[in-house]
Amino acid sequence: MNAYETDEEKVEAIKGWWKENGISVVGGLALGLAAVFGWRAWVDHQEDMAQQASSAFEQLVATVETGNPEAARTQAALLLEKHGDSAYGALANLMLARVEMDAKQPEAARKALEQAMAKAPDPGLARVAALRLARLLMAQGEMDAAATLIAQQDKGEAFKGDFAALRGDLALAAGRPAEARAAYDQAIALGAANAALLQLKVENLPPAT
């Protein structure tokens, strides 16, 4: 009888505890499950969006290669509308700038490069856009603006040689060959792109005095 009463007391204690705490326990479990499944849904959504952006960018690249600027602009606009803040958005703006330059629309290209710089989620992509924008500014004769942009964006080790090459071009355009030589030499040492072209520029500089 004692054992029965003890078991009965245990059952009653459990019932009482559940009556007081059952709702909060169920609520906590529900919240926990919601958090787990909500996180999974969010991850799945992000992966799906990334796949859509990747496919849209591949289509944009293919269209650009066909030489149809209007179609490229349309596809770029659609991609940017949905994925403008992603890396694919920055890449789309870089492609759009190329389209506009080929179409002899430097102002439109400039706008695309500025957008790529402003919204690129990766500093490396932003610097690629900055390099192209600096070259565009120099081609338009905006040397001071190009110099300011280079000074702002030449941070860290990435693309340091390419920024040095642009500083050499600026110095050469300003009639400072010694400064240009030093910048070109630095660019070559840092592994800038088109090192052979930079070496030709160095060889064609007037001899140091």
Q: Could you describe each region identified by the protein language model?
A:
Residues 1-28, 52:
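N-terminal positive-inside, membrane-proximal cytosolic segments immediately preceding the first
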Residues 82-89, 103, 117-126, 153-161, ...:
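Short solvent-exposed coil/turn linkers within tandem alpha-helical repeat scaffolds
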